[in-house]
Amino acid sequence: MSMKGKETMSKQNEKLVVGKLGSSYGIRGWLKVFSYTDNPESIFDYSPWYIDQKGEWVEYKVEGWKRHNKGWVVKLQGLDVREDAHLLTNFEIAIDPASLPELSEDEFYWRELFGMQVVTTNGYDLGVVTDMMETGSNDVLVVKANLKDAFGQKERLIPFLEEQVIKVVDRQAQRIEVDWDPAF
């Protein structure tokens, strides 16, 4: 099993947030880009982009992009002057989740795991996946424990380690089976 993508899910109109626009660059409407994808350059593989403006997703087409110092800059269609680009500084970039590539059966996007029930191999209900963390060595499930958890836990951090900890991920049943001590 492997995890693909650090993308975070935005529930509004089923868009998937994959990055953020930074400050304007130059005088011709370019903007700096901060990518949340595993491979930062892959953010440019998706088009169109959607920018949340006053609660509405506004569609933008990527006209061009290039490497700049240690990051990236992008030119969005319709933004031709610095002042227009500046208005989008710090706005999140989203895409249509349907544009994501299909994964193999043993690969998952983080967003697929959110809301899944987590149970031990002995059947103890640990709670529900509410978030994911990247630690560098492996991804970590953030599991909100049930209100009346027998071990007094409110939240559990469970490493997403195939075979060692994660035994089964059942997309159909929305359930993850883990080899994990409920006291942790």
Swiss-Prot record:
Family matches, as InterPro entries: PRC-brl_dom, PRC_barrel-like_sf, RimM, RimM_N, RimM_N_sf, Transl_B-barrel_sf
> Any idea which UniProt keywords this protein has?
Chaperone, Cytoplasm, Ribosome biogenesis, rRNA processing
Which cell locations does it reside in?
Answer: Cytoplasm
Q: Name one GO biological process term.
A: rRNA processing
Q: Which SUPFAM superfamilies match?
A: PRC-barrel domain, Translation proteins
Cysteines engaged in disulfide bonds, as pairs: none
User: Does the entry feature the keyword Cytoplasm, yes or no?
Assistant: yes
Supply the Gene3D superfamilies for this chain. PRC-barrel domain, RimM
| UniProt KW Oxidoreductase keyword | no
**Molecular-function annotations in GO:** ribosome binding
Cellular component, GO, one term:
cytoplasm
PRC barrel domain location is: 105-184
**Would you identify the family this protein belongs to, as annotated?**
Belongs to the RimM family.
Domain characteristics, as noted in the entry? The PRC barrel domain binds ribosomal protein uS19.
Q: Please give the function described in this protein's UniProt entry.
A: An accessory protein needed during the final step in the assembly of 30S ribosomal subunit, possibly for assembly of the head region. Essential for efficient processing of 16S rRNA. May be needed both before and after RbfA during the maturation of 16S rRNA. It has affinity for free ribosomal 30S subunits but not for 70S ribosomes.
Q: How does it assemble?
A: Binds ribosomal protein uS19.
Instruction: Please state what the protein is called.
Output: Ribosome maturation factor RimM
